[in-house]
């Protein structure tokens, strides 16, 4: 595991790995020539507003003690430097340790996507895929694993496993 030394083990009770979830949002506008933007409905500014608004979800829509990550990792739009594209695709990942926080993030992302598009007279397709739930170790089994590890490598080589936003 990253950060661990050879011969060390780690285990802890509670959340240890985040849920893994993917999203794809396709913003639909109306393409046109860049010299005549008034004849188009440019989806690029819509996408930019949306990405910025997503950054407020964790800081303003979840409790400060609840961990979560919203990462927009791919933005695809257009093929030419003088043409306003018809659409923009945003893709990324969402990570959390609880289903409740995940529900809230998905709800807010959908609202932000739909309302941002409406404000610009664009439309969107919103896809959210829940791939894996969070890994949450029970106290009893985590303690059993720690005792077994300690019997093999010694108690000083068994560390507390910090939660990670990495996933299964």
Task: List where the protein language model places each region.
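Generic non-transmembrane alpha-helical segments
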Residues: 46-61, 108-120, 144-152
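Short, hydrophobic beta-strand segments
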Residues: 25-27, 88-96, 126-130
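An extended, acidic, His-containing surface patch that forms the Zn2+-binding/catalytic region
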Residues: 127-168
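A glycine-rich, aromatic-flanked flexible loop/lid motif
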Residues: 21, 80-89, 112-124, 138-141
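Hydrophobic alpha-helical scaffolding
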Residues: 37-40, 44, 95, 99, ...
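Histidine/acidic-residue-rich, glycine-tolerant segments that coordinate divalent metal ions
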Residues: 1-85, 167-168
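Flexible, glycine/charged-enriched surface loops at secondary-structure junctions
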Residues: 59-69, 82, 116-127, 155-163
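A conserved active-site cap/scaffold subdomain adjacent to cofactor or substrate pockets
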Residues: 81-106
């Amino acid at each position: 595991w990253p950060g661990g030394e050879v011969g060390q083990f780690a285990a802890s009770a509670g959340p240890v790995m985040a849920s893994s979830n993917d999203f794809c949002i396709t913003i639909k506008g109306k393409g046109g020539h860049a010299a005549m933007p008034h004849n188009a409905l440019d989806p690029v500014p819509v996408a930019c507003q949306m990405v910025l608004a997503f950054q407020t979800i964790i800081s303003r829509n979840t409790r400060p003690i609840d961990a979560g990550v919203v990462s927009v990792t791919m933005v695809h739009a257009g093929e030419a430097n003088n043409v306003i594209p018809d659409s923009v695709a945003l893709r990324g990942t969402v990570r959390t340790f609880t289903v409740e926080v995940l529900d809230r993030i998905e709800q807010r992302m959908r609202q932000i996507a739909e309302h941002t598009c409406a404000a610009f007279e664009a439309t969107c397709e919103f896809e959210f895929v829940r791939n894996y739930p969070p890994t949450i170790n029970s106290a009893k089994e985590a303690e059993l694993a720690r005792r077994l590890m300690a019997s093999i490598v010694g108690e000083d080589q068994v560390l507390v496993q910090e939660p990670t936003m990495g996933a299964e």
